Amino acid sequence: MGSPVMWFEITSTDPDRARKFYTQLFDWTGDAPPELGGYTLIDTGAPAEAVGGGIGVADPDGLSPGILLYVRVDDLAATLAKAEALGGSTLTPPTKLPADNGSIAVLADPDGHAVGLWA
């Protein structure tokens, strides 16, 4: 079995505007728990096993505004090493998420497209 897409993330220079746009356009709902620092968890209304997502601020020193897919992997370091061997690069090294929600990393494919990893 392949590695499934587990999460989408929309980053914006104006996350409030992005949240309003996407929730109104697609009839999604959003919740921004205080412990997530303004990051909005999105409920698309799809079944629980569907891909979930969030909307957050773009990092001026990191990822540009855009849409990022997160792929579930067993080993972040091994996947990043494999990506680099295939011509990709590491954009964000493995980083632990709050509340025991696993860890993430972000790679760039050979064309420069960002792809999130979640373990």
State each model region's role.
Residues 3-6, 10, 31-33, 80, ...:
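Vicinal oxygen chelate
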